[in-house]
């Protein structure tokens, strides 16, 4: 028997998400909860059919086609309508639905099944020709765009031209005759672009639409969204074929989107929007600015009462805030979909805490339901209140996604991306955004749209990304072609500064200063619960007391990486390090290093004080020496004068430091082997600082000295001997009983492979996954960006291995080294200090392999704390 690729809504349930996708599983579950009379019925083509489509060379095979045709017949029996029948036609929508919600990422087709014959009969039988022709022109436009990839703009231009000729401003003001003319113009446009007639056979239309949904799983914007949200390519998408409910039959019809709680603030109140005489995509696409959901009560009282009752039932059933789409057809309510709603980080925390307080979920469930990556947005700036009070808004629209943003105006996603890459802060200003704009939206500080509401594409995507967004500013007079707009009498051109307040919807001229965000009470509650359930410690990467203090405020339990070279770049210090580099003898080098020692000691004391007894891992000098030498002629001359050498001699020294591959050159422990006096100086500074701060604070400090880039145990043994002899001497001279540890970074594959040998010398390992990734893959982090996009396009890599740990290769080395290290030294401390320490999927991996801690940048500490708790909760299920 062949595999089952198609399921009626009545055959599925919420547990079948992997097979039916999120939308399909929820439609099946919703059918069970609220009944088939409220949920327009249909069937779901599974994610396995999508995978099969790609395996068969992007073709729907005969078996899957036969099952689809069989289920069309079943759908006809359920609805009493017939596909392609002009007397009683079955019209359907075709939508994608992956396992994870991907709003706006994939394409929807409405009114499929229409052709000229069916439309004429519908127009006559319904007595509503305007509705019939509106459905048809929409279908031609969507099918042409989504299935045949004829750009939307050609059709929009024809609509705008027609409105201009008729002297109207809204699509709804066009008559049945106008829409009939448009439909024929659309078909002519289709033929001109494609070279064949628009398909009239509904089964041909349906297969084309299903293929388009499968194909859209691999479109560029879907690939970008998947990479950003950890959604594997292998999952595929399901396709939902659902009988149509019509919100565009007249003024007793409408369509809307609603949330059971406010997705921007988390407040417990129904929030949403609807449009009368419209179809589903109109609300989300932002073509007309809709009415608040409360006004639906006056228009459709019975449907509104039923809707609020269903909202309550759905939220109680799913135990989470729901995002629902609905249609009212001749005063009767139809529910088209429900899903857990996208929300801002602040709303996510409030909703989670409120659901715990309402007895709906447990603390563990609250911790598990928050996306750790979204916490980042809470820690980002808001407008300075004083400056904000003094500023007068030049416009106001809908506060679609909170936060403060100021930057230069740009008008296209391409410009936003290009300017952003140069380090410019930009505000993307659009009539409305579409999924094609996703990369520009990512690059922008804020987004401002002329059309669209709180549930438009711009609003939903911006909230998901944590980007400030103000939508539906109809006061703007936009001239996209010439890249300018007029607001409150002022013309703004590309490059002019504006500021947006995503919490109020206010728009300001110029730049308003921002201040650091303050964190609310819900953040503290969620973090306290996270700390209760996690076993993995979280440290920070910090080189300055300010970073260390910030990280402690955000819950860091120590410093996992202090890069000492970052302390060498201040004017007085760089002079001393350059003197050391230019020295000819050990004595000269020691003299130069003696100038650096008290400065380093002071730095370490400040870090120890900030950390109040928590562990501090200090990495000894790592980068190659050429990074410290001057490149400008005037600086070279200055160095020659201070060193009593000629410019030529200095240039010769600089030239001698040149390496063909500095990443694998004279750096890390190799510097300490060549110049042990550097390691000795840094050891003295570390130990003296620890002794002083231990006395001052009355706390026990155990310095952790980390030797970088070890690949051979004998290297470590050599440098460790220098460190221990120096440290023991300083401790003895001070009459102290200070204890210290010497460990190493595991960042060379050979170190991972011989970790049992290295653990005999090292009291702790810290995995430097940035270098370990470079050396395992054999490509440079600084150059990989030039070719990684091609690798993503060709499905060689799904993610940037420098952003998410490569669990199959690099991860195997980490796991092996951890096991080997523990076999030789059971109490060895294991950490990770690469950028991966703040990535949730990498944190989960670190939990699984039994590391002691992860270390990440200060602002990512809360992300790591929450991700560690989620990993632990998942592990104990």
Language model features with spans:
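Nucleotide/phosphate-binding sheet-loop regions of phosphoryl- and nucleotidyl-transfer enzymes
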Residues: 1-391, 418, 424-427, 434-439, ...
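Hydrophobic beta-strand scaffold residues
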Residues: 38-39, 469, 830
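Short beta->alpha connector loops at strand-helix junctions that form conserved
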Residues: 41, 450-452, 471-474, 562, ...
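Conserved alpha/beta-domain cores
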Residues: 95, 519, 529-877
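Glycine-rich phosphate/ribose-binding loops and adjacent secondary-structure elements
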Residues: 331-334, 431-442, 446, 454-460, ...
């Amino acid at each position: 028997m062949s595999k089952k690729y198609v399921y009626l809504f009545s055959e599925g349930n919420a547990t079948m998400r992997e097979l039916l996708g999120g939308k399909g599983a929820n439609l099946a579950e919703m059918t069970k909860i609220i009944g088939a009379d409220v949920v327009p019925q249909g069937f779901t083509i599974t994610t396995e059919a999508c995978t099969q489509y790609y395996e068969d060379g992007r073709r729907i095979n005969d078996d899957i086609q036969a099952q689809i045709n069989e289920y069309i017949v079943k759908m006809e029996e359920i609805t009493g309508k017939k596909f392609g029948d002009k007397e009683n036609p079955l019209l359907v929508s075709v939508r994608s639905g992956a396992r994870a919600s991907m709003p706006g990422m994939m394409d929807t087709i409405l009114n499929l099944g229409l052709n000229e014959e069916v439309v004429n009969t519908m127009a006559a039988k319904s007595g509503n020709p305007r509705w019939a022709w509106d459905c048809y022109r929409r279908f031609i436009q969507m099918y042409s765009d989504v299935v045949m990839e004829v750009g939307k703009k050609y059709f929009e231009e024809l609509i705008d031209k027609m409105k201009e000729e008729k002297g109207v401003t809204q699509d709804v003001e066009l008559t049945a005759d106008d829409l009939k003319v448009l439909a024929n113009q659309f078909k002519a446009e289709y033929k001109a672009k494609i070279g064949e007639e628009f398909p009239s056979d509904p089964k041909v239309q349906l297969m084309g639409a299903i293929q388009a949904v499968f194909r859209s799983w691999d479109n560029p914007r879907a690939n970008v969204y998947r990479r950003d949200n950890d959604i594997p390519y292998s999952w595929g998408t399901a396709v939902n074929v659902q009988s149509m409910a019509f919100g565009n039959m007249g003024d007793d019809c409408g369509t809307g989107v609603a949330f059971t709680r406010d997705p921007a603030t988390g407040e417990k109140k129904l929030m949403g929007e609807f449009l009368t005489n419209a179809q589903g995509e109109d609300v989300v696409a932002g073509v007309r600015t809709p009415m608040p959901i409360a006004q639906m009560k006056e228009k459709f009282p019975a449907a509104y009462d039923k809707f609020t009752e269903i909202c309550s039932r759905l939220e109680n059933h799913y135990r989470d805030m729901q995002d629902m789409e609905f249609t009212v057809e001749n005063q009767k309510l139809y529910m088209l979909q429900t899903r857990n709603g996208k929300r801002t980080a602040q709303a996510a925390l409030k909703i989670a805490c409120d659901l715990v307080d309402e007895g709906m979920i447990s603390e563990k469930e609250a911790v598990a339901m928050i996306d750790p990556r979204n916490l980042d947005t809470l820690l980002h700036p808001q407008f300075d209140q004083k400056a904000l009070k003094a500023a007068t808004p030049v416009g106001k629209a809908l506060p679609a996604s909170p936060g403060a943003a100021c930057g230069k105006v740009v008008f296209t996603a391409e410009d936003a991306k290009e300017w952003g890459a140069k380090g410019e802060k930009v505000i993307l200003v659009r009539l409305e955004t579409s999924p094609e704009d996703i990369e520009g939206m990512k690059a922008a500080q804020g987004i401002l749209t002329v059309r669209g509401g709180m549930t438009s594409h711009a609003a939903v995507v911006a909230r998901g990304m944590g980007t400030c967004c103000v939508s539906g500013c109809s006061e703007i007079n936009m001239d996209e072609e010439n890249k300018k707009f007029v607001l409150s009498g002022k013309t703004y051109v590309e490059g002019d500064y504006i500021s947006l307040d995503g919490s109020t919807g206010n728009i300001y001229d110029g730049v308003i200063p921002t201040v650091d965000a303050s964190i609310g009470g819900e953040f503290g509650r969620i973090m306290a619960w996270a700390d209760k359930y996690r076993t993995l410690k979280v440290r920070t990467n910090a080189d300055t007391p300010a970073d260390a203090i910030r990280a402690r405020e955000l819950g860091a339990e120590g410093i996992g990486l202090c890069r000492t070279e970052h302390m060498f770049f201040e004017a007085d210090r760089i002079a001393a390090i350059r003197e050391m580099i230019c020295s000819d003898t050990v004595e000269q080098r020691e003299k130069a290093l003696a100038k650096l020692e008290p400065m380093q000691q002071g730095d370490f004391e400040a870090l120890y004080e900030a950390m109040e007894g928590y562990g501090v891992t200090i990495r000894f000098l790592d980068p190659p020496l050429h990074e410290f030498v001057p490149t400008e002629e005037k600086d070279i001359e200055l160095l020659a004068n201070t060193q009593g050498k000629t410019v030529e001699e200095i240039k010769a020294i600089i030239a001698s430091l040149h390496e063909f591959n500095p990443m694998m050159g004279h750096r890390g422990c190799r510097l300490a082997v060549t110049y042990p006096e550097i390691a000795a100086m840094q050891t003295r500074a570390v130990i003296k600082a620890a002794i002083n701060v231990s006395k001052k604070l009355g706390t026990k400090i155990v310095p952790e000295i980390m030797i970088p880039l070890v690949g051979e145990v004998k290297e470590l043994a050599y440098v460790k001997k220098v460190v221990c002899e120096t440290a023991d001497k300083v401790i003895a001279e001070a009459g102290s009983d200070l204890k210290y540890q010497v460990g190493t970074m595991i960042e060379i594959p050979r170190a991972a492979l011989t970790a049992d040998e290295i653990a005999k010398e090292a009291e702790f390992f810290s995995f430097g996954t940035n270098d370990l990734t470079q050396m395992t893959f054999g490509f440079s982090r600084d150059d990989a960006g030039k070719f990684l996009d091609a690798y993503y396009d060709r499905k060689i890599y799904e993610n940037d291995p420098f952003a998410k740990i490569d669990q199959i290769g690099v991860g195997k080395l980490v796991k092996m080294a951890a096991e080997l290290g523990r076999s030789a030294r059971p109490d060895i401390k294991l950490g990770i200090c690469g950028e991966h320490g703040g990535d949730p999927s990498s944190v989960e991996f670190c939990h699984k392999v039994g590391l002691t801690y992860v270390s990440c940048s200060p602002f990512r500490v809360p992300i790591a704390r929450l991700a560690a708790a989620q990993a632990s909760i998942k592990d104990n299920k």
